[in-house]
Swiss-Prot record:
Pfam families xref list: Ribosomal_S8
Designated gene of the protein: rpsH
UniProt name for this protein: Small ribosomal subunit protein uS8
Free-text function comment from the UniProt entry: One of the primary rRNA binding proteins, it binds directly to 16S rRNA central domain where it helps coordinate assembly of the platform of the 30S subunit.
Phylogenetic placement of the source organism: Bacteria, Pseudomonadati, Pseudomonadota, Gammaproteobacteria, Vibrionales
Organism the protein comes from: Aliivibrio salmonicida (strain LFI1238)
Record PROSITE patterns: RIBOSOMAL_S8
Protein family: Belongs to the universal ribosomal protein uS8 family.
Gene3D superfamilies named in the record: 3.30.1370.30, 3.30.1490.10
Assembly and oligomerization: Part of the 30S ribosomal subunit. Contacts proteins S5 and S12.
A Gene Ontology cellular-component term: ribosome
UniProt keyword rRNA-binding present: yes
SUPFAM superfamilies: Ribosomal protein S8 (SSF56047)
GO biological process: translation
Length: 130
């Protein structure tokens, strides 16, 4: 069976892994998933990530905890295949009053809402992370 929304699957695996206190989660890899993982690592939401395998690459995300609590409290898909959500740079959302991030797909690549606002770019809102 083919996967209809691989990004939602990735976010669900991370959410479920954190709920079950897993050390790491594995999933099929893609360029967009690796870019999202790199952004989450840069923002401090995950400990590390690695791509393993050549024929069928797998993305392994090492989850992060602080004092035995999840670092990611909320991770939510916004734009989905049935309803794409685009915003201009002046209408980009602020997640939890700036405590969280919105992952934005812009013409210059994937970036957080703060970086997109600073660069004056809008784009597709992939997900919210807090």
């Amino acid at each position: 069976m083919s996967m209809q929304d691989p990004i939602s699957d990735m976010l669900t695996r991370v959410r479920n892994g954190q709920s079950a206190n897993k050390v790491a989660v594995k999933m099929p890899s893609s360029k967009l998933k690796v870019a999202i993982a790199a952004l989450l690592k840069a923002e401090g939401y995950i400990a590390d990530f690695a791509v393993e395998g050549d024929i069928k690459p797998e993305l392994e995300i090492t989850l992060k905890y602080f004092q035995a609590k999840q670092v990611i409290e909320q991770i939510q898909r916004v734009s989905r295949p049935g309803l794409r959500v685009y915003k201009k740079n002046d209408a980009l959302p602020s997640v939890m009053g700036g405590l969280g991030i919105a992952v934005i797909s812009t013409s210059k690549g994937l970036m957080s809402d703060r970086a997109a606002r600073k660069a004056g770019l809008g784009g597709e809102i992939i997900c919210y992370v807090a």
